[in-house]
Amino acid sequence: MAITEILPGIHYVGVNDRTTTRFEALWSLPMGVSYNAYLVAGEKIALIDTVEESFGSRLEANIREAIGERKIDYLVVNHMEPDHSSSIAALRRIYPDIEIVGNAKTLQMIEGFYGIAGGTVEVKEGDTLDLGGKTLSFHMIPMVHWPETMVTWCAGDRTLFSGDAFGTFGALDGGITDSQVETDRYWDEMR
């Protein structure tokens, strides 16, 4: 799936995975899974979440397609589950000056999982990050479904980057917003 401009300055740069057959070795993935990552660009650029590390080169290609050779200033980590975070170390190698943004629990987990300390920005409930033309705010939603989970809100664009809070399994097949996704397959599960 190619990158998609959601709104001016906001791009979906995630990746579809049609090869993984089970999530956490338990749940079947007959329709694949998407690893959702987003770029928010003002004067500075933030990447929100990453992808599973074996798809890191595709993420890098998507990023470059969206922003060319501009650097990413911030990596916002909403959720530490490896399908969201396991490309962090690779991104740090590509963008050595990137600052990793997360709450206290997230930053502890990044150090524990990936050995990365330093070059971080700790955020608390309601803190903001000004990208120059776009402002992100951070809101904690612990235990949805890990203890460090947070969401990121871009108020000027009225856009919520929700991590797993409203997620579902399945590759996106070109649809990013709910009006673009075929929902018939989900009705039985919702009942």
Protein language model regions, located:
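Conserved beta-strand hairpin/beta-sheet module of binuclear metal-dependent hydrolase folds
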Residues: 3-65, 151-154, 158-162
